[in-house]
C-alpha cells in the first residue's frame, strides 16, 4: 500500500502491529517515584523503516504521551520531524503517530517522553509493598509477560520484534537498582543516583526487567565465572542459599545439555512480595514469588524445597528456550512453557535422584489430561487474535500437556538423539524467533523419523485418545477414540506411539498406531497367556499422552499385577488414573474403581499413594451428593485403607528417612483429617496447642503443619472459633510466605459454611496479598463449595475490578468447577451470561462444562444398582 493511501483507521482492531517499521535498539531512561507511586521516562528507539510510510504504530497502554514529546529523526537528516497527530487507542493498546511527511526507508530515531503510574495490579511497572525496620515501603518491579512492557514504555511489544536495550535508571541513592545486565556506572547526585546498565543482547520486550528497592543478597559463581545472586528482603538472605546452589548447578547442567553457554555475564534471582505468577524468566534477572525462591531450613517443608528446585530450573531453562530462542508469536507459547516444564524435571532428577521426580511428573500429565478431556479445551498451538486472549493460554495445556508430549517424543526418539537435535535447533535460532514447525524440522533431521506427521496430531488438534484394548484369540484388538470426561464420543484421531509389555518389563513392543482400529499379533502373547500370572500393560511407564481402557479380563489381570507388585510405580499410577477418568466419564462402574483402590494396600511409592488419596477424596465429594446414605461407609472403607500407612509413618520423622517420606506424611495425615478420622484430628489438636505456646517445638515440624491446620479446622464451627482465631494469629505474626500460604490453604477446609464465608471475606481483606488468594480458594472443602459460589456472585464486581489475568481466572475455575448439580450449572451459565469478557471467556466455558460432567457422574453413580451393597461390603471387608 502506498504511503499516501494509509490512514490511521486501518491500524485499529488488528491482532498484530504492522510490519513496515521495526525497532533495532531502545535507549530507555526511567525515573520511578516510589513514594508518589508514579514514574516518568523517555525512550530513543532506533527504528528501521522498511517501506515508505507517514505512520509509526507501536504499543502503549496506560501511559501519558504528549504530542510535543514525540519526534523522529531520519538517519543523516538535518532536521527532526514532528508528528501532525499522536493518537492513543486504549482498546488496542497502540499509539498511532502520524507525520505530514513520508518517512524515508532506512534507519531513524524515534524519541518519546512519557509518564505513568506505578500500579498495584502486579503487571507492567508496578509497586510491591514490603516492611523495612517496621516501616511499610514500596519497591518498583516490572512484570511484562505476556504484553505489559507497553505499560512501562512505548515499544513494539511482540516477541518477534527483538532489539537491543540500553537502560538507565534514576533512583533514590540508598536503593538497589537491578536490570537484565550488570551496572556499568553509578553517578550519585545528592539523594538521587543515575544507574547505567550494560547493553543487552538482542531480546524481546517481554523479557526486559527493572527493580528498585532495599535488598540483601547471597552470591556464588559458576565454574566458568558467571556471577549468580539471590536477592531477598533485608534480613532474609540466608533463605536464598538453597535456590543459589540449585541455580549454579542448573546453569552448568544446561550449558552442557543445550551445548551453548549461558549468554549473559550474570544471573540475578529475586523474591518479590507481591507477584502474580510463580516466577518470571526475565533475561538475567528472574523474579519469583517468595514461596518459589526462599527456603528456611527450620520452617519450610520438603514440598517447599522441591517447589524451589523445580521452579528455579524451569526459569533458568527459559534463558535458552524462550530468551535466546523465542517463540515467533503467542500461538507457540507452549514451546516456551512445555519445554521449560519438562526440562526442569530433567534438572531436578539430575540433582536429586532420590526424589523420583519423573514419577511425580505424572501429576503434571494428570492435570493436562483433566483439562484436555473437556470439549472446551484448546489445541497446544492455539490461535491468538487479541492481547486479552493471551493470559488464558498460560494453562495446563501449554505447560503440562506441552511437557507431556515433549516427554512422549523424547521417549520415542531416544534421549541422545533428542538432545543433539535440540542443541542444533538452539544454535540455529539463537537470538531470533522460531515456530513449532522449526523444532519439528530439527528433530526430524536429527532422528530421520517423521516427527512432523507424528506431532501434528498432538499439537494442532485438541484432546487425546483413549485406546480400548481387548484380548481375542491370541490377538490384541485395539481401537482409539477421543477421550472426553463427559462420556461423549469425540472425533479426533492421533498417531499414537504405543508401547506395551507382557508379564515382564524385559521385553517391550513399540509401534505407531495411526488408524482407528488395529489387531496386533504379539508373538509371545499366546505363550504368555498360558501363565497364571499373565498381564499386559500398554503405555509402559506412562510416557505417552493417552489413556488405556482394558476389557474386564485384562483389567482384573492388572489388578492382580498391582497386588503382586509386578508393575513399576509409574504404571501403578497410570492404571489408577485411567480407571478413575473412565469411571468419571461413565465408561466404568464406581464399584470397579473401589475394588481397584483396595489393590493398593501395600503401596510404597509416594506419588502413587498421593494419587490414590486424591482419587479417594474426589469419590467422597461425589458420593456425598449421589448417595449421602452411603457416605459413612465409604469414609470408613477409606480410613481403614489409609490408617495402616499412617501408623507406619507416624507424625514424627525417623532417622534415615528421605524427602518422599516427608511428602507422604503430610499428604496422608491431611487426607485422614479431611475424612474426619478422630485419632488424627485429636493428635493434631494436641500438637497444635503445644505449638501455639512454643513455636520452636519439634512436635509440629513444617511437613505436618498443613495437616495439623486442616485437622484443627475440622473442629471449628461458628460457636467454637478458637482454632480459627489461633491460626489467624500465627498468620499475622509470621513473616515466612510459605507459612502464610499453609495457613491460607487450611482455613476454608472447615465444614461449617458460616466459617467458610468468614475465611473468604478475610481473603479480600488487606491482610492477604492478592496473589495469595488462590491458596485459600483451592483449600475450600466439600462443605464450602456452594457457599463459595454464592459468595463469588455477591462479590463479583469487586473481584473483577481488583484481580486481573490468571488470578481472575482462578476465582472462576476454583469456585465454579467443583459444583455438582445441573441446577448449579444453569445458575453459573445465567450469572456469567452478561459478565463474560474475553479474558475469562474460555475459563467460564470450561468451568461450567466441569459442573455438567460432575452432575453426570453423580447421576450415573445413583444408577449403579448394587452400590449400597458394595459400600456395605467393602466397609466391613477391609
UniProtKB/Swiss-Prot annotation:
Look up the EC number in the record and give it.
Answer: 3.4.11.2
- Which Gene Ontology CC terms are recorded? cytoplasm; endoplasmic reticulum; extracellular space; membrane
Q: Which domain of life is it from?
A: Eukaryota
- Annotated stretches, region: Required for membrane association: 105-212
**Any one biological process term the GO annotation gives:** proteolysis
Q: Which UniProt keywords apply?
A: Aminopeptidase, Cytoplasm, Endoplasmic reticulum, Hydrolase, Membrane, Metal-binding, Metalloprotease, Microsome, Protease, Zinc
GO terms (molecular function) for this protein are: alanyl aminopeptidase activity; metalloaminopeptidase activity; peptide binding; zinc ion binding
Its localization reads: Membrane; Microsome membrane; Cytoplasm
Free-text cofactor note = Binds 1 zinc ion per subunit.
Q: Which cofactor does it need?
A: Zn(2+)
Q: What Pfam families does this protein's entry cite?
A: ERAP1_C, Peptidase_M1, Peptidase_M1_N
Q: Which residues bind Zn(2+)?
A: 314, 318, 337
Which CDD domains does the entry mention? M1_APN-Q_like (cd09601)
Q: Kindly list the residues the record flags as site (Transition state stabilizer).
A: 399
Query: Catalytic positions?
Result: 315
Question: Where's it mainly located?
Answer: membrane
Residue numbers binding substrate: 145, 278-282
What enzyme class is recorded for this protein?
hydrolase
The text the record gives for the protein's domains is: Dileucine motif seems to be involved in protein-protein interactions.
The similarity comment for this entry is: Belongs to the peptidase M1 family.
Q: How does it assemble?
A: Homodimer.
Q: What is the name listed in the Swiss-Prot or TrEMBL entry for this protein?
A: Aminopeptidase M1-A
Source organism (scientific name)? Oryza sativa subsp. japonica (Rice)
Q: What is the lineage of its organism?
A: Eukaryota, Viridiplantae, Streptophyta, Embryophyta, Tracheophyta
